[in-house]
């Protein structure tokens, strides 16, 4: 979209992929799975599937000696691994919902970046910027690999460039960043019971 001194771009994409694991390389070994069923497109357990959704937008407004721009985006990464329910601990029951979902991760990412460029003279250029990102990861499945977490980061910057001619330039700047992350604790009661049965405290 372009109107006078303002222009913007928008992009969206979605990628889906489903891959089977080599029989016997994951989950419960089963000799029957080594037999060819005649269907080259048939993906049975165990398998993994990934869906990646991304939306980005860029905005820019220019007037006189000032250029203001911003980039904003959202990403959703959803990964699942499916395998016939199996466990190393005899006390772990079959899940009531999605009993064959071994692992699942749902990562949401929100990002933004804003920059203000000032052209004070033909030789001097100043840039002020701010960017931030927020992530939230949730999990499910009867196995555990990565924890749930919330992550936030942000930063401010100032950059100055001196360009006396077309062959020489000097740049200097400063940046400040701040970030936090909260990782949820994960307790595996079935593992604890198993270890206690093995004599561990």
What name fits each language-model region?
Residues 1-201:
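Outer-membrane beta-barrel proteins, especially TonB-dependent receptors
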